[in-house]
A protein has these predicted regions:
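Intrinsic-disorder/low-complexity detector
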Residues: 1-121
Length: 121
């Protein structure tokens, strides 16, 4: 299994999963992207921009839901700094970087689904 690369593609994939789960906890809408959605000349910084931009809005929306949604959102929110490197990968991913990104994404999404069940999409 690919591991985190020096430029943070594995962590960027984990961050993408965390941002998607935060969005889902806030809205209960959509399906998580499949790993293949991140293949083919993608730039991690662009894949993460919308989720990072709406993170606080999603946190506030989830707060209004309260209960288990809020508890899950707090846990996910607390993990985000671990996935956020000093600089997001800003160039098109090569095949190894792509594999690391997808592996990080799939690993983290699976962990959230195991921990939060249907709340994680």
């Amino acid at each position: 299994m690919p591991t985190e690369t020096p430029n943070g593609h594995f962590a960027a994939g984990q961050l993408r999963a965390a941002l998607w789960v935060m969005q889902y906890l806030a809205t209960s809408e959509g399906q998580p992207p499949e790993g293949d959605a991140f293949r083919g000349k993608k730039v991690p910084a662009r894949l993460l921009a919308a989720g990072l931009g709406s993170l606080m809005r999603n946190l506030l929306l989830t707060r209004r839901h309260g209960g288990d949604r809020w508890k899950a959102a707090v846990e996910v929110f607390h993990e985000i700094p671990d996935f956020l490197k000093a600089e997001l990968p800003g160039t098109t991913m090569g095949s190894g970087e792509e594999r690391a990104f997808v592996a990080g994404y799939e690993k983290q999404l699976a962990a959230y689904r195991e921990k939060f069940g249907t709340l994680a999409g």
